[in-house]
Structures are given as structure tokens and as C-alpha cells.
Amino acid sequence: MTSVAKVYYSQTTQTESRPLVAPGIRRRRVLTKDGRSNVRMEHIADKRFLYLKDLWTTFIDMQWRYKLLLFSATFAGTWFLFGVVWYLVAVAHGDLLELGPPANHTPCVVQVHTLTGAFLFSLESQTTIGYGFRYISEECPLAIVLLIAQLVLTTILEIFITGTFLAKIARPKKRAETIRFSQHAVVAYHNGKLCLMIRVANMRKSLLIGCQVTGKLLQTHQTKEGENIRLNQVNVTFQVDTASDSPFLILPLTFYHVVDETSPLKDLPLRSGEGDFELVLILSGTVESTSATCQVRTSYLPEEILWGYEFTPAISLSASGKYVADFSLFDQVVKVASPGGLRDSTVRYGDPEKLKLEESLREQAEKEGSALSVRISNV
């Protein structure tokens, strides 16, 4: 009796098992190259209610154009709302001119005879302009209570809105944009070991404290019971030459993962650029100037992992004795020894996509026994 294969998702079990990459469909990634989630949430019960329960996070995550629109609408709305209340107070007290108040009548709010005047008084009170033309008299205690309530409520509202603005500006997200990952990962020998390498650089002079780079291998995994786990996550460890847990990220650094018998990458088709997996890289650290925790993310698909290449050296020494990091060389790679074969003595620089295409053409020509001359540019 054969067991029925099941597919497990985040919170949902379905009866159909589909690969991450279907034939003829462009390979999709869970995480974009700039670290944003590429997952769409659907069929969430009471989604709006859940967002309203956590207003602070909702407002901070809100895009700037909506935040500015909400900011303006909130202030204008409170001015108008309390203006209507002030107008109703004037109507109830008989302060309007069309009601024919007696000559010795003392209004609740002096010079408030129309809805426009009530709106202007509400605006002047809330913004503490205080022109002096419209003011509260001692005749109406209700007006005094209303003024206190308006100032207290609107002050709380201003504190909340201002706090969300400051929190959004101070988020370490913008600091994360000055941390750069290489566009491609490369596989070559390093210190006699086959390694998968990525390059990371800090483009600011201020440092990140306690940097750590971790990796997650995402792929479909089938258990012994026949269950297909969509996007199974496996840890992939990275280190620098010093094997330190906290590298000194003052210059562009290359992080290594040794592809040995214990590596989760050992059975993957890294050389062919094919396969159904995604390698997610996460760099975490503390911003030196603000002590806020910063996280930078990127991901690599199989075609973004280059076999038999190393990164071009991007650090040099100037005539004045200063180290220079040339970011025009940051993503460039050089053809080196093909892992498992002899070292190629010809050094080639250029665009990784072009190099990868030319290398595949060269290998195809060698298999057919024909001589093929491929010109590689230094662009």
C-alpha cells in the first residue's frame, strides 16, 4: 500500500504537490536581491482588525505618501470636528446672531457666530496661535471643559504621530542600504578546500559592531514518510579567514562556506547552475552611532552561483599609504582553477554573466573536439 504524499505550507495543508520551479515558468525567489520579502499573504481572517490592533507598527510600516496624507487629514479632521462641537455649543447657548441674543448677552466664545468662526477658533486653540480676537468667557463652564478636552486629546495625537515619524526616520533600514552584497556567489578552492564565497562591504566609515553572516538554504524536502516540505530551511555557516564570530567590516570582506561532507550544499548541482533551491544570506550587526540592531538580507539562485571563479581583488594601497576600496571591482570575478581539475593559467576579468556563457560555450566545444576561440573582454 503506497502512502499518500502530503505537502506542508506555513499554516496550510494541501493535497497537491508542486515544485518551486515548474517547467516553462521563470524561477521565483522568496527574497529579492535587495532583501525584501517576495511572499504574498492571502486569505487572512480579520486582516484589517489585526493591523488596527497594532497601530504603532502599522503606521511605522506605512509608506511615506500615505503617512503624510494621514498626518494632514488627521489634523484637518480634528480642527473641523472640534469646530463643529464649538459651533453646537454656540447654538445651544444662543450665541448666534440669527438667534437674536439680547444686548447684554455674554457668549461662551466671543466672536464665534458662524461655523467658519468656530473652525478658526478650534484651529487657533489647537495650534496655540492665540490671536486674541476669539476667546472663551467665564459664562459657560462647558466651553472650558471642552477646551481642556481638545488640548489633551490633540496633544496625545500629536505625540503619537510625531513619534511614528521619528521612529520611521531612525529605523536602521536606511543604514542597511549602505551594506552591499556581491551580485554573485562563487565556488572555488580556498586554502585547499572547496568553498562557496560571497563578498560583503560596508560603504560607510561608521562601523557595524558584532557582525555575523548566516545562511539559509531553502528547497523542497521530502521526508521518510513521503511528506514534501515546501521551502525547508537548512542552516549554512559562513566565516572569514580568521574564523572570528565578529569580523571587522572596515573593508570589503569575503565570507567562505566550506563545501565538505557536512555541508548542506554538497549534493546540490552548483556547477551546472541548475536546481530548485535558493540560498538566503543574512548579515546582522549593531549600528555604532545609534546602537540599533541592523539586518541586511539577499539571496542567490542557482544561476547566480558561478563555478570556478574568484572575486577580483578590490583593495589597493595608495601612494599616500591609505587603503583604497575600489567598488567598481566589487562584483567582478576572475576565472581560476576549475574545482576538481587543473588550474587555468589564463586570468579573465569581466561581467559574470558573459563569463559564464563563454565558459559554457568553451566546454561544449571541447566535448565536441572542435577548437573554439572565444574572446573575453575586460569590461
From Swiss-Prot:
Outcome recorded upon mutating residue 67 to M: Increased activation rate by PtdIns(4,5)P2
GO biological process, one term: L-glutamate import
Name of this chain's protein: ATP-sensitive inward rectifier potassium channel 10
Subcellular location as annotated: Membrane; Basolateral cell membrane
Similarity section: Belongs to the inward rectifier-type potassium channel (TC 1.A.2.1) family. KCNJ10 subfamily.
GO annotation, cellular component aspect: apical plasma membrane; astrocyte projection; basolateral plasma membrane; cell body; ciliary base; microvillus; monoatomic ion channel complex; plasma membrane
Disulfide topology: 108-140
Domain of life: Eukaryota
Keyword Zinc: no
